Amino acid sequence: MVIAMKKLDVTGDICPVPVLKTKKALEELNEGEELEVVGDYKPALENIKRFAENNGYTVVLAEETESRFRIVIKK
């Protein structure tokens, strides 16, 4: 089975914008689909992760490098 994945790039955005964009994108997904969010404002990673977990989504992956972050959330 192939899981559909939508991608969202929040590079250049600072909080609360990445969380708001993530919320909107997740609302547009069907149950079981995944959203990959990438960006460069590292505090957004924890904020997005917390938002997802507090709202019943599953965080599949959360990682960061020196200058970027990536999080995959399943609806």
From Swiss-Prot:
Stored CDD domains: SirA_YedF_YeeD
InterPro entries assigned: TusA-like, TusA-like_sf
One Pfam family from the record: TusA
Active-site residues annotated for this sequence: C15 (cysteine persulfide intermediate)
Top-level lineage group: Archaea
Gene3D superfamilies: TusA-like domain
Family as reported in the entry's similarity comment: Belongs to the sulfur carrier protein TusA family.
PANTHER family documented for this protein: SULFUR CARRIER PROTEIN MJ0990-RELATED, SULFUR CARRIER PROTEIN YEDF-RELATED
Protein name as annotated: Putative sulfur carrier protein MJ0990
